[in-house]
Amino acid sequence: MTFKAFFIRSIVLTLSIVVLVVSFNVCMNEYGLFGDVSGKSIKIYGNERTSKYLLSFNYIPANFDGLLIGSSVSDNIDSKEFVGCRFYNASINGTTVAELKILVDNVLAKGDLKCVILSLYPILTESDEKRTTRMVPREYWGSLGSINTLDFYRRKILINMGKMYDYFDEYGRYDYNLRKAGRDSKRLIQKEAERMSPNEPIGINDRAYADLDSLLKAIRASGIKIFAYYHPIPQEYFVMYEQSYRTYKEKLNALFETPDVVWDYNTADFLDFRRDHTNYCDHVHLSRKGIEFITRDINRKLASQL
């Protein structure tokens, strides 16, 4: 065989493999990117940021008319229990407003949302960084065949074999409580309180603050109802930065308008909840008991406003 013939055969073989891989991934449509996916149920098996980014192009707008957005403190909330709309939990572990805005913008471009629930917690506005390089357009085409795609199928196989936790459902909930069962939340809360100093500061990044303002304006411009709540912080260490929290809350409240529904779980009305360590699975994230309480309270507000 001549070098030329070998080269041509190699090119043809390579192209054939590429076509097969792309065709397979289009057929599997694991992120709901292609065609009509209304009525489909798609779970996350790969990286949360990448997955929710890709799902926001088509799957979420095709199947949901409500969003729950926030950081890890709302990531484990079962949004299918909410009333009034079909809510997708688009919260992301350790996220910032800059990342959430990418997801929301994608959904707004194609979807018909009625309602957005925003979980407010200091991590959202402490930085303007995007904490990944994987929420970018190249990931759209990378879903047709890349290292990330291989990792996706590896995780899916291991989860289906029972070798890894099945954390996510088709509503986007990240049920990390599965791995936190049995943790001593009282000890973890006390440890967090010991770590903090009196008058612990809560920083707000200027660009992150502007991102939040831009996000809220974009949601309102689409005629979508905004609900926002301040995540309940365990009282034992909430007192360590209560003064700076007031400043933080006043600044964020200035971004909301009269039609928006905003409330705070760190007021005296919810003191008993925040003193009860069993409402938490660690130092700040909610236990199943805590989630049930918060869900019931949110549903009362949804039922009266939608």
Spans of features found by a protein language model:
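Short extracytoplasmic
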Residues: I44-G70
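Membrane-embedded segments
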Residues: L68-I147
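C-terminal regions of proteins
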Residues: M240, Y248-L306
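Extended, basic/helix-rich recognition subdomains
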Residues: E192-T258, W263-Y265
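Extracytoplasmic/secreted proteins, especially bacterial periplasmic and envelope-associated proteins
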Residues: E99-I102, G145-N148, F152, K156, ...
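Hydrophobic membrane-insertion alpha-helices, especially the h-region
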Residues: I8-N29
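Secreted/periplasmic serine-hydrolase-like ester/acetyl group-modifying domain
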Residues: L120, E129-I224
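Alpha-helical transmembrane signal-anchor/signal-peptide segments
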Residues: M28-S51
